[in-house]
Amino acid sequence: MNLKEILPEKVADLLLVTSFAEFATLNAKGVPIDTPLLNFPDEDLSKINMATGLSYPAKAERARRNPKVGLLYWPLYPGEPVVQVVGLAAVRDRNIQDNMERYLAETSHVAPETPWTVKRKAIWYWARIVIEIQPKEILWWDSPEAMDQPPHRWEAPADTVFAPSDPAPDSPGTQSPKWPEPDWRKAAETDVGADYPAYLSLVDHDGFPRVVRARDVRLEADGLSLDLPAGMPGRRSGPASLTYFGRDTFVGTLAEAGGRVRLTVERTLPILPFVGEGNIWDPAPEVKAPFMRRLEAELARRGQPMPVVPGDQPQLSEGARLRAKRDTKGADEGMFERKAE
């Protein structure tokens, strides 16, 4: 199905040129967990593609167990819409070498300040499981300010066939290393105090995770109080999580509270050192070693060799060039400069 021809031009354009989108999966307890991931959709938008590292495969494992996923695309520029997608995911890990080459062509423009001679060594990052999402429903609002109104909507035809995931490896999965799990209140004090963008993930009546950006977050005794757009459809209660940049993620239970919603926080998720230290390309040996051990074990589960990163940076796909152009436009216009304090 060619969604590029079906959706309004502004909606299709945002899906095609956005570098990062919020991506939510459901854990084994049915809690939605959101992480911002690099976005590389098919040219016709029949599939929206994401990926996670084979050395940290939790997102893919969740999507294979429960294929219901949610996405949120937030505008960078005036005139762009807000787009929310729910769909069914298919996990692709039959050929990690092919996945890596595909991912390089779609995303290696990111972090242009780091030389390719450095980035190419990060096999723990480039070895990828691809997650292909077929949209089931797409909602959009003309702008963030319009989100108190009901959304526009597209739904997949009832006879749509959704592709299954590749079969899971026969052997049991590997365990994640024990990374730091910060005190939720200290993390919340920093995030709320800095007024960082906050993304709430909750579960709708059909069991799909939905991601929405909170307008206002306030720290309370045992949780967080949030203001949500009135036009956001579906229930506002149940298992939920709130994330800032995919770094601090607060997990708990959501309930309506006097025109707002309240997340009673149970815990925060551990922080991957790549995210916490901001060093994907050249991490400390004590960080790199457990990722490499897990990568080798996950490859062995699949009977696949260690993928080989090319010596020269691969040519970017047309979609990657469009996304890089949009990112550069923002930098050229000074939109991403740090504001004076």
Report residues per predicted region.
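Binding-site signature for planar aromatic cofactors or substrates
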Residues: 1-341
